[in-house]
């Protein structure tokens, strides 16, 4: 499955959320990560993130698709993210 994770969390937790997410996904833009995950790894990621966030003030969204091939990606402006991640 292909997962896009988008988060908006309290400043105190940003670094911790990013550290957890980068164990599973590639950073592509501020507060956005994406990549292929097995269902088991996806569940582990959600569990780790849910233990860290404050559900009263933080928001984390997961967009889950069967494959990266089911959508088109267009970037305007600067490409951000980790080197070596190619679409």
UniProtKB/Swiss-Prot annotation:
<dbReference type="InterPro" id="IPR021127">
    <property type="entry name" value="CRISPR_associated_Cas2"/>
</dbReference>
<comment type="similarity">
    <text>Belongs to the CRISPR-associated endoribonuclease Cas2 protein family.</text>
</comment>
<dbReference type="GO" id="GO:0046872">
    <property type="term" value="F:metal ion binding"/>
</dbReference>
<dbReference type="GO" id="GO:0051607">
    <property type="term" value="P:defense response to virus"/>
</dbReference>
<dbReference type="GO" id="GO:0004521">
    <property type="term" value="F:RNA endonuclease activity"/>
</dbReference>
<keyword id="KW-0378">Hydrolase</keyword>
<dbReference type="Pfam" id="PF09827">
    <property type="entry name" value="CRISPR_Cas2"/>
</dbReference>
<keyword id="KW-0255">Endonuclease</keyword>
<protein>
    <recommendedName>
        <fullName>CRISPR-associated endoribonuclease Cas2</fullName>
        <ecNumber>3.1.-.-</ecNumber>
    </recommendedName>
</protein>
<keyword id="KW-0051">Antiviral defense</keyword>
<comment type="function">
    <text>CRISPR (clustered regularly interspaced short palindromic repeat), is an adaptive immune system that provides protection against mobile genetic elements (viruses, transposable elements and conjugative plasmids). CRISPR clusters contain sequences complementary to antecedent mobile elements and target invading nucleic acids. CRISPR clusters are transcribed and processed into CRISPR RNA (crRNA). Involved in the integration of spacer DNA into the CRISPR cassette. Functions as a ssRNA-specific endoribonuclease.</text>
</comment>
<keyword id="KW-0479">Metal-binding</keyword>
<keyword id="KW-0460">Magnesium</keyword>
<keyword id="KW-0540">Nuclease</keyword>
<comment type="subunit">
    <text>Homodimer, forms a heterotetramer with a Cas1 homodimer.</text>
</comment>
<feature type="binding site">
    <location>
        <position position="8"/>
    </location>
    <ligand>
        <name>Mg(2+)</name>
    </ligand>
</feature>
<dbReference type="InterPro" id="IPR019199">
    <property type="entry name" value="Virulence_VapD/CRISPR_Cas2"/>
</dbReference>
<dbReference type="GO" id="GO:0043571">
    <property type="term" value="P:maintenance of CRISPR repeat elements"/>
</dbReference>
């Amino acid at each position: 499955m292909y997962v896009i994770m988008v988060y908006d969390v309290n400043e105190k937790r940003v670094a911790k959320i990013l550290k957890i997410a980068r164990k599973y996904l590639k950073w592509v833009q501020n507060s956005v990560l994406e990549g292929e995950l097995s269902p088991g790894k996806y569940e582990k990621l959600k569990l780790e993130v849910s233990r860290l966030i404050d559900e009263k003030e933080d928001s984390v969204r997961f967009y889950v698709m069967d494959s990266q091939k089911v959508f088109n990606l267009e970037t305007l402006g600067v490409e951000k993210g980790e080197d070596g991640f190619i679409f």
